[in-house]
């Protein structure tokens, strides 16, 4: 029998404490970093992190090997199922990189001729994964050389590592097929493939991540999963881990199979797990929060662990991978000292895991336990977290009927059919980033920085006018991030200097920390909007980030309901919208790209969420008069699940990421009777390629088949912050040309029918 471990974490970050992998990747893609250098960077990061975890005292160390982009994409490579369009792509193996690296990155980023795979959010987080593309004819061909090499390297370095892989159910549940077949048709076959793979792994333990087991899974599928894991269990040392939700379904499905361990997320739902566990396998208790930044209540956690230990073997872990939190609090030197004591980043969470495991074995670190108790008491009684009184009525969340608003807006805006616009941000050039850095370092005065941003806004306005766009944006040069910008201007938030987490690939974000009562001390965007609007006769959109997205993309206080915090943010945005209207804004965009992320994974819990999420958005926007058009933007979402909520938001225009998913959202819009304005994106900005006119025209034609042309907008998928000016200009020329061509066709059809 494989001996049990006592302390571990669910998974590891890959990007590096100082974003080393990000810079190596971007250098490799641009040709300034060699394949050998990229491989060495990934190797160093993997080795150093394993060393740190071992030194911290963990007795089982998770490893995914050298990952260059995403765990789901790693699994696609492992199973040999890159999309068909890339299968004939000639690989050019670089020393130190896997032989499939060209197909790997083509799947993630596309090529000049071929689009990338779809990308969407990982369950209810702000991390993104590459969606596998399968078909009924898919054949899995193990390509495990890189994985086995990486595991062997760590074993020779003396580490007790545990490979972490995406499990069969989760991999297939998150896949899409190109022929309409069911990905789960491959379930039994994939279990057979994993059986062969696990037999080759030289480690006592192997971890298979099955977060899909916390979602709604059909009973017949659970039976097939149970049968599959019964086969894998014979290997010994198989640890099936779940996270992001209650573990009752997983425990019921997997109990009694002879698995070595089952992991559950006690942060999301500890009570259910306590009831469901029968004490037969090692329970890996995810009791340290892996996706938020607050210190653990060590005394309460130890009490829970002791109750579990009375029923069977227990190991201490994080609730999910530490991919979702910053590396270490020690890198932050400028935080509010009081709030700092309330926090724990990745390094500190590992220390908490070890302390709890030691305490469970009878060795209590009294200084750490006392410090945690003192911090929790201070946070509970701090004036920074005091409640804000708000007398909110149903009328505060309501506007006039859409038909009334649409008539007023059509008269106020006088736009052509199929109006063209962008989502908000324009390229953040080296000059913009330099000016911001120099300003923060004190090398530019506020006046000099303001002048630099105003000059950039003027350039963006001129460029849009030259391109022929109908509704303009100011380009957001003053914003380093669409959430952090507002967090720095609202009370109740703090921001970090090195609190980076991976969003996707080389893209990293620094989520702000929402620690207290949210208020708006002064206007945040009005002066930038007013300057932009003064430069043009065309309408310029006021640009705000919505309350749910600010919530979803921040580390949020966990001592009051999310609905209460969302309304606090909404009231601050409501004040900003009132000021924008007073400054002359006729269109105000309130982005909610993250509204899908916080949706509970089980249907029984979703209605309550959508009520308060929709309510917060409407609370922020309902102050706008009828003639002011409210836009919102959404991306990376499974819109079919949210179509009713999108309608309930009651935004006048909703722009949606759609190009990468071949306009799949259109069917949902059509079947729902969606009657509001909509702009399904016709250009995938996440791929570094300029779309062909025929490609954009085809997407626009598809949209016209499902959307009333009087309510259809033409726009890219997302903001243009990460793109260069050359590709942005070229792509927008294509977008405008496609819109003009479609307008001509509409007018011709109208004259013919007349």
Curated annotation (Swiss-Prot):
Residues involved in L-homocysteine binding: 423-425, 476, 591
Positions bound to L-methionine: 423-425, 476, 591
Reactions catalysed, as given in the entry: 5-methyltetrahydropteroyltri-L-glutamate + L-homocysteine = tetrahydropteroyltri-L-glutamate + L-methionine
Gene Ontology biological process terms, A to Z: methionine biosynthetic process; methylation
Enzyme Commission number, as recorded: 2.1.1.14
Keyword annotations of the record: Amino-acid biosynthesis, Metal-binding, Methionine biosynthesis, Methyltransferase, Repeat, Transferase, Zinc
Listed InterPro entries: Cbl-indep_Met_Synth_N, Cobalamin-indep_Met_synthase, Met_Synth_C/arc, UROD/MetE-like_sf
Enzyme class, spelled out: transferase
Record: active site: 686 (proton donor)
MF terms (GO), sorted A to Z: 5-methyltetrahydropteroyltriglutamate-homocysteine S-methyltransferase activity; zinc ion binding
Binding residue positions for Zn(2+): 633, 635, 657, 718
Pathway membership: Amino-acid biosynthesis; L-methionine biosynthesis via de novo pathway; L-methionine from L-homocysteine (MetE route): step 1/1
Superkingdom in the source lineage: Bacteria
Cofactor(s) in the UniProt record: Zn(2+)
Entry binding sites for 5-methyltetrahydropteroyltri-L-glutamate: 19-22, 121, 507-508, 553, 597
Xref: Pfam families: Meth_synt_1, Meth_synt_2
Note on cofactor: Binds 1 zinc ion per subunit.
Family listed: Belongs to the vitamin-B12 independent methionine synthase family.
Main function: Catalyzes the transfer of a methyl group from 5-methyltetrahydrofolate to homocysteine resulting in methionine formation.
Protein name: 5-methyltetrahydropteroyltriglutamate--homocysteine methyltransferase
Species: Corynebacterium efficiens (strain DSM 44549 / YS-314 / AJ 12310 / JCM 11189 / NBRC 100395)
């Amino acid at each position: 029998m494989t001996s049990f471990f006592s302390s571990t974490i669910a998974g590891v970050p890959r990007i590096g404490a100082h974003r080393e992998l990000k810079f190596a990747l971007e250098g490799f893609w641009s040709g300034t970093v060699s394949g050998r250098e990229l491989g060495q960077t990934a190797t160093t990061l993997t080795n150093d992190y394993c060393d740190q975890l071992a030194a911290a005292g963990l007795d089982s160390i998770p490893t995914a090997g050298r990952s260059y982009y995403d765990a789901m994409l790693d699994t696609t490579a492992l199973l040999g199922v890159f999309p068909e369009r890339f299968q004939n792509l000639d690989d050019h193996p670089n020393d130190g990189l896997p032989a499939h690296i060209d197909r790997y990155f083509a799947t993630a980023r596309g090529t000049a001729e071929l689009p990338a795979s779809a990308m969407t959010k990982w369950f209810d987080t702000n991390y993104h994964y590459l969606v596998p593309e399968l078909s009924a004819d898919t054949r899995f061909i193990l390509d495990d050389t890189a994985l086995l090499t990486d595991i062997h390297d760590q074993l020779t370095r003396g580490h007790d590592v545990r490979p972490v892989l995406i499990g069969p159910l989760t991999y297939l549940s998150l896949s899409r097929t190109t022929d309409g077949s069911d990905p789960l048709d491959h379930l039994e076959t994939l279990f057979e493939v994993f059986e062969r793979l696990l037999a080759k792994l030289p480690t006592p333990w192997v971890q298979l991540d099955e977060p899909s087991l916390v979602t709604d899974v059909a009973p017949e599928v659970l039976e097939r999963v149970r049968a599959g894991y019964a086969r894998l269990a014979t290997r010994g040392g198989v640890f099936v881990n779940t996270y992001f939700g209650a573990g009752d379904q997983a425990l019921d499905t997997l109990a009694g199979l002879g698995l070595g361990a089952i992991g559950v997320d006690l942060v999301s739902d500890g009570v259910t797990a306590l009831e469901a566990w029968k004490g037969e396998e090692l329970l890996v208790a995810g009791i340290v929060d892996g996706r938020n930044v607050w210190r653990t209540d060590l005394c309460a956690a130890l009490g829970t662990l002791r109750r579990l230990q009375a029923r069977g073997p227990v190991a201490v872990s994080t609730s999910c991978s530490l991919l979702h939190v910053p590396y270490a609090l020690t890198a932050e030197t400028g935080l509010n000292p009081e709030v700092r004591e309330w926090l724990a980043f990745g390094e500190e969470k590992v220390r908490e895991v070890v302390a709890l495991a030691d305490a469970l074995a009878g060795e209590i670190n009294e200084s750490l336990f006392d410090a945690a108790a003192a911090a929790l008491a201070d946070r509970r009684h701090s004036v920074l977290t005091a409640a804000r009184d708000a007398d909110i009525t149903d009328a505060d969340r309501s506007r006039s009927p859409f038909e009334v608003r649409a008539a007023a807006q059509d008269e106020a805006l006088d736009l052509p059919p199929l109006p063209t616009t962008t989502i908000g941000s324009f390229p953040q050039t080296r000059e913009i980033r330099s000016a911001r850095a120099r300003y923060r370092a004190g090398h530019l005065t506020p006046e000099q920085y303001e002048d630099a941003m105003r000059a950039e806004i003027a350039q963006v306005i001129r460029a849009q006018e030259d391109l022929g766009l109908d509704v303009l944006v100011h380009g957001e040069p003053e914003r380093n991030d669409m959430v952090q910008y507002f967090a720095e201007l609202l009370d109740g938030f703090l921001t970090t200097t090195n609190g980076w987490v991976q969003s996707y690939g080389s893209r990293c974000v620094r989520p702000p920390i929402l620690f207290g009562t949210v208020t708006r001390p002064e206007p945040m965007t009005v002066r930038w909007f007013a300057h932009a609007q003064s430069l043009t006769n065309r309408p310029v959109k006021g640009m705000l980030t919505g309350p749910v997205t600010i919530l979803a993309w921040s580390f949020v206080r966990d001592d009051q309901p999310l609905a209460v915090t969302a309304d606090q943010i909404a009231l601050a945005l409501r004040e900003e919208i009132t000021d924008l209207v007073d400054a002359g804004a006729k269109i105000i965009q309130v982005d909610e790209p993250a509204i899908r992320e916080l949706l509970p994974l089980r249907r029984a819990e979703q209605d309550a969420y959508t009520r308060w999420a929709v309510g917060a958005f409407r609370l922020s926007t309902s102050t706008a008069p009828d003639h002011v058009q409210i836009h919102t933007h959404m991306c990376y979402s499974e819109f079919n699940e949210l179509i009713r909520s999108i309608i309930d938001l009651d935004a006048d225009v909703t722009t949606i990421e759609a190009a990468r998913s071949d306009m799949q959202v259109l069917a949902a819009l059509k079947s729902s009777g969606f009657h509001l304005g909509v702009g399904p994106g016709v250009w995938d900005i996440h791929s570094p390629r300029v779309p062909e006119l025929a490609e954009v025209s085809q997407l626009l034609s598809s949209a016209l088949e499902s959307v009333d042309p009087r309510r259809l907008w033409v726009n890219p998928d997302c903001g243009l912050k990460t793109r260069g000016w050359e590709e942005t200009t070229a792509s927008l020329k294509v977008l405008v040309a496609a819109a003009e061509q479609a307008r001509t066709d509409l007018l011709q059809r109208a004259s013919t029918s007349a």
